[in-house]
Amino acid sequence: MSHIAKIYTDKDTTLDPMKGKKIAVLGYGSQGRAWALNLRDSGLQVTVGLEREGKSWEQAKADGFTPKKTEDAVKDADVVIFLVPDMAQRLVYRERVQPYLREGMDLVFAHGFNIHYRLIEPPSNVDVYMVAPKGPGPIVRDFYVKGGGVPVLVAVHQNHSGKALEKALAIAKALGGTRAGAIETTFKEETETDLIGEQTILVGGVMELMKAAFETLVEMGYQPEVAYFETINELKMIVDLIYDKGFMGMLRAVSDTAKYGGFTVGKQVINEETRRRLREAAEKVRSGKFAEEWIEEYGRGSPTLSKGLEEMDKSLEEQTGRRLKEIIERGRPKS
C-alpha cells in the first residue's frame, strides 16, 4: 500500500550544507543552464564543465561563467552534478569523473537511470544523491526568477557523510524547488515511475492515442485539418485545465455533452485490456528489461529510434500540424 510522501519546503531547509563548496555542473543544456544560473543566483560557487568548446561553451560565457573542460571542473570540485544526457553519463563518469574522485565528494543526479541500473557504480566513500526537478529547464529558471519554484524529488543512494539528505535539500532550495516542495523518494521509485510515465502516458500513450484518433477520423472521410484540431490541437487546452484546476475543474469547464461522452466512451477506449498492457509495460521497466533493451539499442546507433523519428516527421499528423501552424499562431494573443 502506498504511503504519504515526506515533503520539505523552504522552512525545513537551509543552504548551509552547500556554502563554501565548489560545485561543478556538467552540461549546459536545458537543465544544466537552469541549474547553474539558479545555484549561482542563490549564492553558491558554481563552475560549468563541458566536453568541448561550442555553442554551450559560448552560452555559458555569455551568462557570466568561465567554463572548463569537464575533467578540469571535476578536479577542483567538491560536488559534481551530472546534467549531460542519460546515455552519455556512463562514459563521462568513467573517463572524466572517476579518475578524480576523492573521499568526501558528492555525486548529484537529476535522474536515477544510471545509478539504479548500475551503469555507474561510485565508490562507497562519496555521497550519491538526486535532485530531480519536475519540469523542463527553462521553466525551472523562469519560475525561480519570478520568485517561485518547480517541485523536485530528492533521494539518497549513498550517505557516506551522514548528511546527504541535508545536502540534497540545500541544492533543492538553491534551485527554488523548496518554494513549492521537495518530495522525498528513492532512486528506484524516481527512475521507474519516470520511465513508466514517459512510455505509457507522456510520450508513448498520449501520442499514440492522438494518432489513432486522428487516423480514424481521416479514414472515415473527415478532413485532416478538422481532425487535427479535434484530436491533437485541443488536447493542450484540456491538459492546461487539468494542470490548473484538477480533473473536476476541467469537467466543470466543458459541456455536459462532453462530460457524458467522456464518462461513457472513455472507459470503452481505455478498458481492462489497456490496463493489462499498462501493467506489462510497467513490469518491463521494473524488471530492468527496458533498460537492457535501450542500452543495446543505443549501442547499435539507435536504429529503432531513428526510424520512429523519420516516420513521425513524414506522417500525415505532422504534415497537417505544420500547415495549420500559421492559423494557430495567428490567433495566439500577443503578450
From Swiss-Prot:
Similarity comment: family membership: Belongs to the ketol-acid reductoisomerase family.
Residue ranges, compositional bias (Basic and acidic residues): 308-335
Cofactor: Mg(2+)
Gene Ontology BP term (one): isoleucine biosynthetic process
Positions annotated to bind substrate: S255
Pathway as given in its UniProt record: Amino-acid biosynthesis; L-isoleucine biosynthesis; L-isoleucine from 2-oxobutanoate: step 2/4; Amino-acid biosynthesis; L-valine biosynthesis; L-valine from pyruvate: step 2/4
Catalytic reaction(s) noted: (2R)-2,3-dihydroxy-3-methylbutanoate + NAD(+) = (2S)-2-acetolactate + NADH + H(+); (2R)-2,3-dihydroxy-3-methylbutanoate + NADP(+) = (2S)-2-acetolactate + NADPH + H(+)
Entry binding sites for NADP(+): Y28, G29, S30, Q31, R52, S56, D86, M87, A88, Q89, G137
Recorded GO MF terms: ketol-acid reductoisomerase activity; magnesium ion binding
E.C. code: 1.1.1.383
Domain of life: Archaea
Residue positions of the active site: H111
Name by which UniProt lists this protein: Ketol-acid reductoisomerase (NAD(P)(+))
Residue ranges annotated for the KARI C-terminal knotted domain, each copy included: 186-331
Start and end residues of each KARI N-terminal Rossmann domain: 5-185
Binding-site list for Mg(2+) 1: D194, E198
Region (Disordered): 301-335
General function of this protein: Involved in the biosynthesis of branched-chain amino acids (BCAA). Catalyzes an alkyl-migration followed by a ketol-acid reduction of (S)-2-acetolactate (S2AL) to yield (R)-2,3-dihydroxy-isovalerate. In the isomerase reaction, S2AL is rearranged via a Mg-dependent methyl migration to produce 3-hydroxy-3-methyl-2-ketobutyrate (HMKB). In the reductase reaction, this 2-ketoacid undergoes a metal-dependent reduction by NADPH or NADH to yield (R)-2,3-dihydroxy-isovalerate.
Note on cofactor: Binds 2 magnesium ions per subunit.
UniProt binding sites for Mg(2+) 2: D194, E230, E234
Sorted UniProt keywords: Amino-acid biosynthesis, Branched-chain amino acid biosynthesis, Magnesium, Metal-binding, NADP, Oxidoreductase
